[in-house]
């Protein structure tokens, strides 16, 4: 049973996706585990790193074939790139290998936090948009950088919740919620740092359009079960957002209004 209407779909660059979950494909214990997780999450897209595919050994020989069998749209990424030239070249190679003009643009500026390089990210995004790519940039919750990426031609953004692989959940709720509030018409997909389904549910309740998951699923004890749990959490959060949650209050407010006399006094049988 689904919580949402089939009409409530994620739209990116004019293309609709039935699921608001995007799933990464790295670091699973086995290809079977990856396959089971994709089947459980039923993601709208799966991300794939060009370098992984090019460097795949015998154990990974069936990786691309597995993705084809699931028939899920691919979102190549530029993971590991640290310069503009490297990111642009990797994106162009990925377009040839995976036969898609979609690209998740990653340009890392710090090896410790894996924080994006904001200046290089904007320039690389502009170059790739000009080259015909549909660019989904991995960025922080910085509103000014987000606007510059939109000015560069990006139509959707992928702000982090926390540094990649930390599983901390959203570390700056204020900044992320301000980003959502100030860019109400821009598709925003929270990427990185989510650790458990409640984290995903939370950002969906705030009105974000989707989440991208990898480590939280692939490093779980049971990835398939976690993938399904995340998908359910995303659906629940989206449904709650669409339902219009009540406003939080500082003081208690009775849920049952008291009007007149108790019902057992109304028949006159009690003094």
Swiss-Prot record:
So where does 1-deoxy-D-xylulose 5-phosphate get bound? Answer: 165, 192-193, 214-215
The entry's cellular-component GO terms read: cytoplasm
Q: What class of enzyme is it?
A: transferase
The gene is thiG
Indicate the transmembrane segments per the record.
none
Q: What is the similarity comment for this entry?
A: Belongs to the ThiG family.
Q: What is its EC number?
A: 2.8.1.10
Please name the HAMAP family in this protein's record.
Answer: ThiG
What this protein is called in its record is: Thiazole synthase
| InterPro entries linked to this entry | Aldolase_TIM, Thiazole_synthase_ThiG, ThiG
Catalytic residues (UniProt): 104
Q: Main role?
A: Catalyzes the rearrangement of 1-deoxy-D-xylulose 5-phosphate (DXP) to produce the thiazole phosphate moiety of thiamine. Sulfur is provided by the thiocarboxylate moiety of the carrier protein ThiS. In vitro, sulfur can be provided by H(2)S.
> Catalyzes what?
[ThiS sulfur-carrier protein]-C-terminal-Gly-aminoethanethioate + 2-iminoacetate + 1-deoxy-D-xylulose 5-phosphate = [ThiS sulfur-carrier protein]-C-terminal Gly-Gly + 2-[(2R,5Z)-2-carboxy-4-methylthiazol-5(2H)-ylidene]ethyl phosphate + 2 H2O + H(+)
Tell where it localizes.
Answer: Cytoplasm
Q: In which pathway does it act?
A: Cofactor biosynthesis; thiamine diphosphate biosynthesis
BP terms from Gene Ontology: thiamine diphosphate biosynthetic process
Q: How does it assemble?
A: Homotetramer. Forms heterodimers with either ThiH or ThiS.
Q: Which UniProt keywords apply?
A: Cytoplasm, Schiff base, Thiamine biosynthesis, Transferase
């Amino acid at each position: 049973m689904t919580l949402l209407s089939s009409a409530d779909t994620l739209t990116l660059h004019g293309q609709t996706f039935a699921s608001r979950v995007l799933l990464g494909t790295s670091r699973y214990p086995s290809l079977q585990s990856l396959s089971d997780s994709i089947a459980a999450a039923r993601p709208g897209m799966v991300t794939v790193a060009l370098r992984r595919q090019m460097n795949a050994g015998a154990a990974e020989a069936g990786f691309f074939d597995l993705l084809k069998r699931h028939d899920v749209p691919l979102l190549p990424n530029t993971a590991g790139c640290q310069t503009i030239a490297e990111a642009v070249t990797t994106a162009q190679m990925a377009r040839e290998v995976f036969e898609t003009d979609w690209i998740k643009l990653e340009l890392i500026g710090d090896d410790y936090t894996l924080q994006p390089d904001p200046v290089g990210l904007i320039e690389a995004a502009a170059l790739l948009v000009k080259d015909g790519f549909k660019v989904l940039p991995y960025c922080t919750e910085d509103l000014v950088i987000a606007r510059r990426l939109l000015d560069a031609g990006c139509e959707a953004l992928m702000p982090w919740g926390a540094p990649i692989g930390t599983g901390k959940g959203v570390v700056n709720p204020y900044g992320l919620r301000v980003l959502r509030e100030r860019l109400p018409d821009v598709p925003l997909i929270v990427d990185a740092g989510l650790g458990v389904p409640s984290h995903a549910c939370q950002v969906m309740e705030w009105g974000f359009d989707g989440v991208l998951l990898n480590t939280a699923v692939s490093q779980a004890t049971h990835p398939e079960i976690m993938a399904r749990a995340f998908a359910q959490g995303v659906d629940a959060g989206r449904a709650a957002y669409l339902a219009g949650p009540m406003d939080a209050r500082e003081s208690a407010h009775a849920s049952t209004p008291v009007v007149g006399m108790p019902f057992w006094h109304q028949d006159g049988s009690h003094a």
